[in-house]
Amino acid sequence: NPAVGWLIPQPWVIDADGDRVRFDDIVGGHWTVLHTGTDAAAGAWRSAGVPVLRIAGPGSAPGADRIVDRDGTLLRWLEDKKTSVIALRPDGFVYAGGTPQRPLPPPPAGFTAQANRVKDHA
């Protein structure tokens, strides 16, 4: 997948509470799966304790499992990388990616996210 190995951008996003925050304030330091639509292939990651978040476009409503890409930076980046779902490492680099035609690979055998949750920045 063309996104693998790249450092993801750090734009402003809208969190579940409707606050404008840096993307890293939400996912920084934790494994996270991000997707642009369906997260069907992310089930194995979720079972391993990894949060799964949808990236919604500008003007969308935020939610518990959805962040809003304020200016479309993340969505454009994913489109440029020809991917719709990624597994993001704690350091912000893309570990794995997928598309509807090539689903996101599962985590490595035995992988479990330790005390992994999206940051509570309230």
Please place each PLM-identified region on the residue numbering.
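Helical substrate-recognition/capping region of FAD-dependent monooxygenase/halogenase enzymes
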Residues: 1-122
